C-alpha cells in the first residue's frame, strides 16, 4: 500500500486530479502494482479525503495538553509520538490534524509502524486533506518518500 501511495504522491500534486478510479487502477497496474495494494491504497486515500475534520475540531479549541491513552502508548513508539509533537509544535499539524493522524496510525498493522512509515502517513494525510506544509518540515517528511534528503 505504501509504495502505491508514494507513487501517487510523486505523480500527482492534487489527489482530486486522479479522475476515474478504474482508469487510475489500470494505470497503476501498468506500472506494476498489484490489485490488492492498489485497492488498499485507494480505499485508504478515499477514507482520508472524505473524512470530515469536524469530529476532531474540538482538539483545536483551547490549549490543553495531549495525553496518550495506555493503548496508544503501547502502539505508538516514543519516536512516533515525538514526531507528532514536533510537527504540531512547528505548525505542520493542527491539533485536529494530529488526532486524525493518530487515528490513521492506529489503523496500521503494528509491524508496519516505524518512524518512516509515520512520516509517510503524515505526509499522505496532509496531502489528501490538501493542507499547507512549511517547506522545511515538508522536506523532513519527504525523506521518508525518497529515503534521503531532497534539498542540499
From Swiss-Prot:
InterPro entries: Smg. Pfam families: DUF494. Disulfide bonds: none annotated. HAMAP family: Smg (MF_00598). Belongs to the Smg family. This is Protein Smg homolog. The gene is smg.
